[in-house]
Curated annotation (Swiss-Prot):
<dbReference type="GO" id="GO:0007005">
    <property type="term" value="P:mitochondrion organization"/>
</dbReference>
<keyword id="KW-0010">Activator</keyword>
<dbReference type="GO" id="GO:0140297">
    <property type="term" value="F:DNA-binding transcription factor binding"/>
</dbReference>
<comment type="subunit">
    <text>Interacts with RBPJ.</text>
</comment>
<dbReference type="GO" id="GO:0034599">
    <property type="term" value="P:cellular response to oxidative stress"/>
</dbReference>
<dbReference type="GO" id="GO:0005739">
    <property type="term" value="C:mitochondrion"/>
</dbReference>
<feature type="disulfide bond">
    <location>
        <begin position="126"/>
        <end position="136"/>
    </location>
</feature>
<dbReference type="GO" id="GO:1905448">
    <property type="term" value="P:positive regulation of mitochondrial ATP synthesis coupled electron transport"/>
</dbReference>
<feature type="disulfide bond">
    <location>
        <begin position="116"/>
        <end position="146"/>
    </location>
</feature>
<keyword id="KW-0539">Nucleus</keyword>
<feature type="short sequence motif" description="Cx9C motif 2">
    <location>
        <begin position="136"/>
        <end position="146"/>
    </location>
</feature>
<keyword id="KW-0496">Mitochondrion</keyword>
<dbReference type="GO" id="GO:1900037">
    <property type="term" value="P:regulation of cellular response to hypoxia"/>
</dbReference>
<dbReference type="GO" id="GO:0005634">
    <property type="term" value="C:nucleus"/>
</dbReference>
<dbReference type="GO" id="GO:0043565">
    <property type="term" value="F:sequence-specific DNA binding"/>
</dbReference>
<dbReference type="GO" id="GO:0005758">
    <property type="term" value="C:mitochondrial intermembrane space"/>
</dbReference>
<dbReference type="GO" id="GO:0045944">
    <property type="term" value="P:positive regulation of transcription by RNA polymerase II"/>
</dbReference>
Length: 153
């Protein structure tokens, strides 16, 4: 009979042993869930880093830089070629064959480089020193007035 009682107790104990296993399983499941919850936080940390501009933003920035560079280049090119070449007047300037005494270094520099060379020099210095050419509009206006006054436009 000991066998019979053993078999009965063994049959009775497995359901009792299964119940604690089922209770233990939910305890293990919460332990497994925190690492899963930690994984999204690890994924979320790169999103907190500052984003780099997209391709379109980089292209727009490059285009803006090209446009500003082109505007500065054209303005400087027109100032230099228009100031030194006489502005394309139909009648060429007649050379002065009379001898004149220089009245100072300023006058001599103006005669050797054209009547608006000081204005051109000031405008170019402003354009080189300023990041925005619009800040040099005053110098550009003075240069334009000089060119008009000397018949170079």
């Amino acid at each position: 009979m000991p066998r019979g009682s053993r078999s009965r107790t063994s049959r009775v104990t497995p359901p009792a042993s299964r119940a604690p296993q089922m209770r233990a399983a939910p305890r293990r499941a919460p332990a497994a869930q925190p690492p899963a919850a930690a994984a999204p936080s690890a994924v979320g940390s790169p999103a907190a880093a500052p984003r780099q501009p997209g391709l379109m933003a980089q292209m727009a920035t490059t285009a803006a830089g090209v446009a500003v560079g082109s505007a500065v280049g054209h303005t400087l090119g027109h100032a230099i070629t228009g100031g030194f070449s006489g502005g394309g007047s139909a009648e060429p300037a007649k050379p002065d064959i009379t001898y004149q005494e220089p009245q100072g270094a300023q006058l001599q520099n103006q005669q050797s480089f054209g009547p608006c060379s000081l204005e051109i020099k000031q405008f170019l210095e402003c354009a080189q020193n300023q990041s925005d050419v619009k800040l040099c509009e005053g110098f550009n206006e003075v240069l334009r007035q000089c060119r008009i006054a000397n018949g170079l436009m």
